């Protein structure tokens, strides 16, 4: 699993544990997710390419470094992925935002796209796909396949929790796409929930059932 990165920073692990607690309120869960996504954004963007530019400080001219290439794109897998956006935008406020909506066909159990909205000129952009949970991995794999049609420079997948099954599915379909997660949990149950997990991330973010 050389392309799987578990972010084990103490603050990330501390906040994730607080989110897992069943008595965490919607407000607390949402706040912690924002803080976690900000912390994770630092790790995920660590290898972004840089270019040299000449600038004027108040005292002299110097060569500084800025991010190279087109603006980064954050792509949320609806709806729970939206909970990642504000925290990540704290780190990369100039990023563009895309959304992709998928549901599982009850007969085939395969993901079906119902919404796809991206910024213009996606070719040669770096994309970070966000979804709190990597469970079966089918939706993540479908989303990445759809995004590859736009010929981006790179794609990364970021989640809070991953199941081994989801990691295997996404890696098999897209071995070139790195996975960043705060934890890899034990397994999926019969209903497709990650164990021990944290429940339904979308419901806990938005206060729904």
Curated annotation (Swiss-Prot):
Uracil binds at residues 194, 199-201. It catalyses: UMP + diphosphate = 5-phospho-alpha-D-ribose 1-diphosphate + uracil. NCBIfam families: PRK00129.1 (NF001097), upp (TIGR01091). Catalyzes the conversion of uracil and 5-phospho-alpha-D-ribose 1-diphosphate (PRPP) to UMP and diphosphate. The keyword Transit peptide does not apply. Belongs to the UPRTase family. Binds 1 Mg(2+) ion per subunit. The magnesium is bound as Mg-PRPP. Allosterically activated by GTP. GO terms for molecular function: GTP binding; magnesium ion binding; uracil phosphoribosyltransferase activity. The keyword Ion transport does not apply. Its EC number is 2.4.2.9. HAMAP family: Upp_B. Keywords: Allosteric enzyme, Glycosyltransferase, GTP-binding, Magnesium, Nucleotide-binding, Transferase. Pathway: Pyrimidine metabolism; UMP biosynthesis via salvage pathway; UMP from uracil: step 1/1. Its cofactor is Mg(2+). PANTHER family: ADENINE PHOSPHORIBOSYLTRANSFERASE, URACIL PHOSPHORIBOSYLTRANSFERASE, CHLOROPLASTIC. This is Uracil phosphoribosyltransferase. GO terms for biological process: UMP salvage; uracil salvage. It holds the Pfam family UPRTase. 5-phospho-alpha-D-ribose 1-diphosphate binds at residues 79, 104, 131-139, 200. It is an enzyme of class 2 (transferase).
